[in-house]
Every structure is written in structure tokens, then in C-alpha cells.
């Protein structure tokens, strides 16, 4: 639990931009979902073993940390990659666009779990990356915006 306490302090001090708790799908799925959410790309470290990239990671966390704050983290960590502005996933010689990855991810079970009802009611969902909003405001889509992340620290 000491690591979670340190993580909580790192978050309070602004050294962590975002976090994702791994599950049975491991780093690959976690990093992909984080990228889908923010619209940025990811360059995975060349020395990361592919077996580790796809292995279950129960209890592990992926953190997005500003480059200038990595060395000041108080938790034990391993750098697995970096966020890029090019909207691509890259590892070694392999590269895939974020758009292609999203299509593969959403299209796999499209016949079973439809994401398009075929009806057009005029409403359209869009991926939006990094818009600045005033703290504590609700935008035109009904989304609440905050710069504060709260983590339960009483357990």
C-alpha cells in the first residue's frame, strides 16, 4: 500500500496527468484505450518484451507523466513509452494509425454489438482531444470538466 500512498502524493503534486488500471488484457489494451480517449499517439520503448506488452497486468497501472516530471516521481516505475502528437502507435518497425486501430477495435464485433443503429437523428458523436474548459463547468454536450482527479485513499 506504500506505493499507492506515494502515487496519491504524485497525483496531488501534479506529476501524473492520467492513469489506467490494467486488467487481463495488459499494457497493449490499456495504452490503446488511453490513446483512443485523448487522440494522441504512443511510441513504445524498443526494449519492452512483446510478451510483457500482451500479458495480464492485474494490479499494475499505466501512468501518463509529463517528460519533465518523470524523474521526480516518488513511486517505483518503468518507462514503457512516450505520448506523441502524430496519432500513431509505434513499436520497433511496426506502426499503425490511431484511426486504423479504432476501426479494428470497434469493428470486430460490429455485427453482434452494433455501434450504428442505421437511424439518423442528427446527433453525432465525435472524438475530441484536449480542449480547455473552465474548471467545474458543464459543456454544451452535458459533460462536466475538471482538472482534479480524486482517488480513494482510505483503504
Indicate where each model-derived feature is located.
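Intein/HINT protein-splicing elements and their conserved insertion hotspots or analogous self-processing inserts
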Residues: 1-55, 67-155
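Short hydrophobic/aromatic beta-strand micro-patches
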Residues: 62-66
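A structural-propensity feature for long, helix-poor, extended segments
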Residues: 57-59
Amino acid at each position: 500500500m506504500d506505493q499507492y500512498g506515494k502515487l496519491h502524493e504524485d497525483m496531488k503534486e501534479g506529476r501524473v496527468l492520467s492513469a489506467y488500471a490494467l486488467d487481463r488484457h495488459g499494457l497493449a489494451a490499456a495504452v490503446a484505450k488511453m490513446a483512443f480517449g485523448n487522440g494522441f499517439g504512443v511510441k513504445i520503448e524498443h526494449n519492452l518484451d512483446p510478451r510483457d506488452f500482451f500479458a495480464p497486468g492485474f494490479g499494475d497501472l499505466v501512468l501518463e507523466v509529463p517528460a519533465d516530471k518523470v524523474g521526480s516521481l516518488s513511486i517505483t516505475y518503468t518507462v514503457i513509452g512516450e505520448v506523441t502528437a502524430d496519432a500513431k502507435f509505434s513499436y520497433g518497425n511496426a506502426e499503425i494509425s490511431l484511426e486504423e486501430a479504432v476501426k479494428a477495435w470497434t469493428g470486430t464485433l460490429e455485427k453482434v454489438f452494433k455501434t450504428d443503429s442505421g437511424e439518423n437523428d442528427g446527433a453525432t458523436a465525435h472524438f475530441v482531444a484536449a480542449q480547455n474548459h473552465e474548471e467545474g463547468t458543464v459543456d454544451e454536450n452535458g459533460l462536466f470538466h475538471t482538472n482534479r482527479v480524486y482517488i480513494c485513499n482510505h483503504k
